[in-house]
Amino acid sequence: MGDNKNNGDSGKLLYCSFCGKSQHEVRKLIAGPSVYVCDECVELCNDIIREEIKEISPKRDNDKLPTPHELRAHLDDYVIGQDRAKKVLSVAVYNHYKRLKNSSPKDGVELGKSNILLIGPTGSGKTLLAETLARSLNVPFTMADATTLTEAGYVGEDVENIIQKLLQKCDYDVEKAQRGIVYIDEIDKISRKSDNPSITRDVSGEGVQQALLKLIEGTVAAVPPQGGRKHPQQEFLQVDTSKILFICGGAFAGLEKVIEQRAHVGSGIGFGAQVKGEKDKATISETLSQVEPGDLVKYGLIPEFIGRLPVVATLTELDEEALVQILSEPKNALTKQYNALFEMEGVELEFREDALKAIAHKAMSRKTGARGLRSIVEGILLDTMYDIPSIDGVVKAVVDESVVNGESAPILIYERNETQVASGEQ
């Protein structure tokens, strides 16, 4: 019988030398010198090797933790301004991963989680800060939109789906996922509709806050290995969310009025009160920097939820000068990205200073912050990017203020020193 198993003569059945299955029981049988191995055994060996690599890799990842100064320097490379927020984030993130490295309590002192709440206007860099931190630490990162979340059992996305997305980002490696960062955007949109608890269910407001509580604080979430609930017999993955850093962000429109109302209570009215002039009035950013937990409760976040986000950082509204810097200075600046695209066609792209200022001015007037810069630049260069692959001899394209304002098309410079306005201007 043993001779038959390894006999490759025609008419004889071949068997896997490892599991003993015949060639008819498996999809593929791979031959070696006097031995055979089936596809199932190969897959099993791969799984064993992958598991061993998983056990080793987290230890390697944890060897060197960047200091707050190093984290801040990395943020400076990609994010313009927001100095205070960068410092707060760098310290909070450093403390979080220091806590993970020293997980055994010393003298019975257990370190709490330092989840973060970012408050700032649209396009001020909240998402970019969180994403850049995850990249600098080489940890998995995922984003969720709070407005799409609902309580379990209601139509919408369950909060547990956030962990599912994080697992997908690291190929369902639970150890890696547990060291990841989750950014939940539009968190202000799940504030409850009034200060008074309602007898009706608020499934997309307070209900979601309640559902997020345990996840953010730390619980063991059961997640299906490949998503969905189609296979009840599948063994669920157990993910400890106490090791995951949660960063929540929102614009919190109108919060400054709540803060001002609190600040002005007891400031005096009548003839003896001091009247503040226009110059004495704080900007929205300055007012938001004075936020207190009570203000967030009045805004509509429940006290328990605020308690799970002990680190609060406020971001300032970007001015025109900051937007000009964002366009050209960061490592991943928009102008550098479009330069790279044009270089692939053998064309140099030049943005003149007046063009950068005009783009920034347009973004300011649209009130979109840095988020609106890409759509403006894309609109300016669309026709040129459409035409250049079909035009021979172009070596340079120049964008100035008139191009941004729609008065002319980018200037194209040819190899023979001929200058011509790009198509679109007759």
Curated annotation (Swiss-Prot):
Residues 4-57 form the ClpX-type ZB domain. Belongs to the ClpX chaperone family. It comes from the Bacteria. PANTHER family: ATP-DEPENDENT CLP PROTEASE ATP-BINDING SUBUNIT CLPX-LIKE, MITOCHONDRIAL (PTHR48102:SF7), ATP-DEPENDENT CLP PROTEASE ATP-BINDING SUBUNIT CLPX-LIKE, MITOCHONDRIAL-RELATED (PTHR48102). It holds the Pfam family zf-C4_ClpX. The lineage of its organism: Bacteria, Pseudomonadati, Pseudomonadota, Gammaproteobacteria, Alteromonadales. It comes from Shewanella oneidensis (strain ATCC 700550 / JCM 31522 / CIP 106686 / LMG 19005 / NCIMB 14063 / MR-1). The gene is clpX. This is ATP-dependent Clp protease ATP-binding subunit ClpX. ATP-dependent specificity component of the Clp protease. It directs the protease to specific substrates. Can perform chaperone functions in the absence of ClpP. Keywords: ATP-binding, Chaperone, Metal-binding, Nucleotide-binding, Zinc. GO terms for biological process: cell division; proteolysis involved in protein catabolic process.
